Amino acid sequence: MSRIIVITSGKGGVGKTTTTSNIGIALAKLEQRVLLLDADVGLKNLDLLLGLENRIVYNGLDVLNGECRLTQALIQDKRQPNLTFFPLSSNQLKLPVTKEQINDLVDQLKNNYDFILIDSPAGIDEGFQVAIHTAKEAIVVVTPEVTSIRDADKVIGLLEAKGITDISLIINRLRPEMVKAENMMSVTDVKDILGIPLIGVVPDSEQVITASNRGEPLVLDDKVSIPGLAFINTARRIMGEAVEFIDFDSVTSTNPLKRLIKNLVKRSDKSY
């Protein structure tokens, strides 16, 4: 039986889809059977980051409309045979997918994979509600910024209201030099504010951007890099391993940004 995990963020532009692609491939390299489901109807980008955009013939909407079999819409990654990609829709047509439909598709697939990772749309609208409907676990991706953390707080509330209580945190694009200068939230600050278990910390890096632009997620590179190692370690923690975190958070001080974000979160709308 699959572990069905939705990867979400609330705010767009935090690297959620990049995180999904790298964690998916990292899990596959760790001998797990992984399905990456792009649930961002109309604005899909996971295919580009995986370098699979030219191999898409059918998608989930085609399956639902009876135009193809489910197996025809699944794309096996030739670089990593344990990884399968499933686009829910095309960029050309933004048609609604219902909660019942995504649930039916996942039900047909869940016995064939160890992990199903669902790349959720940014925001908290209907697309988000559909993406989280079939999930049993959630990973919230944030950057150490005011807006990202405030939106993540809202998303966590929505997930809990849906009954998803197994929620983990990934802090992305951390810049240690800014943390030391007290111009960015530290790992400890973000953990304390959001109050959910930390499962990954990924530093900001041009290597991630370059790899994404090539359609080759960083974890595919045989050369060891700090962000690549961070993604792999995150995948290992998802599998239940006790993996020590890279120490990015060596500065302890009273950061004024921490107080600011705490106040913002307290003022945010809690009526989910």
From Swiss-Prot:
Name the UniProt key words of this record, in alphabetical order: ATP-binding, Cell cycle, Cell division, Chloroplast, Nucleotide-binding, Plastid, Septation
GO MF terms listed in the record are: ATP binding; ATP hydrolysis activity
The Gene Ontology biological process annotation of the record reads:
cell division; negative regulation of cell division
Name recorded for this polypeptide: Putative septum site-determining protein MinD
What is any one of the record's Gene Ontology cellular component terms?
Answer: cytoplasmic side of plasma membrane
Q: Which Gene3D superfamilies match?
A: P-loop containing nucleotide triphosphate hydrolases (3.40.50.300)
Superkingdom is Eukaryota
Q: Which family does it belong to?
A: Belongs to the ParA family. MinD subfamily.
Show the InterPro entries listed in the entry. Answer: CobQ/CobB/MinD/ParA_Nub-bd_dom (IPR002586), MinD (IPR010223), MinD_FleN (IPR025501), P-loop_NTPase (IPR027417), ParA/MinD_ATPase (IPR050625)
Q: What taxonomic ancestry is recorded?
A: Eukaryota, Haptista, Haptophyta, Prymnesiophyceae, Isochrysidales
Positions bound to ATP = 11-18
Compartments (UniProt record): Plastid, Chloroplast
In which organism is this protein found? Emiliania huxleyi
> So what does this one do?
ATPase required for the correct placement of the division site.
Q: What is its main location?
A: plastid
